[in-house]
Swiss-Prot record:
It is found in: Cytoplasm. Pathway: Amino-acid biosynthesis; L-histidine biosynthesis; L-histidine from 5-phospho-alpha-D-ribose 1-diphosphate: step 4/9. This is 1-(5-phosphoribosyl)-5-[(5-phosphoribosylamino)methylideneamino] imidazole-4-carboxamide isomerase. Its EC number is 5.3.1.16. Keywords: Amino-acid biosynthesis, Cytoplasm, Histidine biosynthesis, Isomerase. It comes from Aromatoleum aromaticum (strain DSM 19018 / LMG 30748 / EbN1) (Azoarcus sp. (strain EbN1)). Belongs to the HisA/HisF family. It catalyses: 1-(5-phospho-beta-D-ribosyl)-5-[(5-phospho-beta-D-ribosylamino)methylideneamino]imidazole-4-carboxamide = 5-[(5-phospho-1-deoxy-D-ribulos-1-ylimino)methylamino]-1-(5-phospho-beta-D-ribosyl)imidazole-4-carboxamide. It holds the Pfam family His_biosynth. CDD domains: HisA (cd04732). NCBIfam families: 1-(5-phosphoribosyl)-5-[(5-phosphoribosylamino)methylideneamino]imidazole-4-carboxamide isomerase, PRK13585.1. Its main location: cytoplasm. One of its GO terms (molecular function) is 1-(5-phosphoribosyl)-5-[(5-phosphoribosylamino)methylideneamino]imidazole-4-carboxamide isomerase activity.
């Protein structure tokens, strides 16, 4: 199982938000490229970037920081990016400039046709990000709840040809309260494509719990606050996941 470090970008810095609130941000590094290199040195095999300003503005906003990370990472490991992706030109630009996977979140819910077109134009490169509370999907940086059931939407997007689904449990993200394994497994069991867990990972116990159900279709887990604040040692956690699951995966 892949443990994927999150690098959340706000105003060119690496930050973490608590419960998705832009004005409740903790700056962890003013050098995102150095942070990317740090996680690679700790054993990361994929990076998760979020353009937070872009997510709220609906268009790319942290171009310089993203470029610096891509330049630093090179061909070492794949990078997935979300936040502010609302059109095919933006996707093409990122893919042409070193990003491996594009995450589409709010735009997928509000404009399913865009997601469908993106999957057709860039097969194998589109990941859908679904943020949910109590099984219902949220959009616009979690500021608006919808009536959409997360499993129903994910199955629809699977038919479009998305590469994977990132499932974030909003109630737990950035709170170090433990990952919602039950909800993640329920989604993974309903799909043929892999699920990447996100939100709430706090300790080695969460890694153990996810590895125990990896066979249900959980390919990885995104971790942020825990590895930045020291609650979770990334290198130890990735080694633990490899040990439990018999190697890289």
């Amino acid at each position: 199982m892949l443990l994927i470090p999150a690098i959340d970008l706000k105003d060119g810095h690496c930050v973490r938000l608590k419960q998705g609130e832009m004005d409740d941000a903790t700056v962890f590094s003013e050098d995102p490229a150095a942070m990317a290199r740090h996680w690679i040195e700790q054993g990361a095999r994929r990076l998760h970037l979020v353009d937070l300003n872009g997510a709220f503005a609906g268009k790319p906003k942290n171009g310089a920081a993203i470029r610096s990370i891509v330049d630093e990472v090179g061909d070492d490991i794949p990078v997935q990016l979300g936040g502010g992706v609302r059109d095919l030109d933006t996707i093409e630009h990122y893919l042409d400039n070193g990003i491996s996977y594009i995450i589409i979140g709010t735009a997928a819910v509000k404009n399913p046709g865009f997601l469908h077109d993106a999957c057709g134009a860039f097969p194998g490169h589109i990941i859908v990000g679904l943020d949910a509370r109590d099984g219902k999907v949220a959009v616009d940086g979690w500021s608006k709840m919808t009536g959409h059931d997360v499993v129903d939407l994910a199955k629809k997007y699977e038919d479009y040809g998305v590469e994977a689904v990132i499932y974030t449990d909003i109630g737990r993200d950035g709170m170090l309260s433990g990952v919602n394994v039950e909800a993640t497994v329920r989604l993974a069991q309903a799909l043929r494509i892999p699920v990447i867990a996100s939100g709430g990972i706090a300790s080695i116990a969460d890694i153990d719990a996810l590895c125990a159900v990896e066979a249900e279709g959980i390919m990885g887990a995104i971790t942020g606050r825990a590895i930045y604040e020291g609650a979770l040692d990334f290198a130890v956690a990735q080694a633990r996941a490899d040990e439990l699951n018999g190697g890289e995966g």
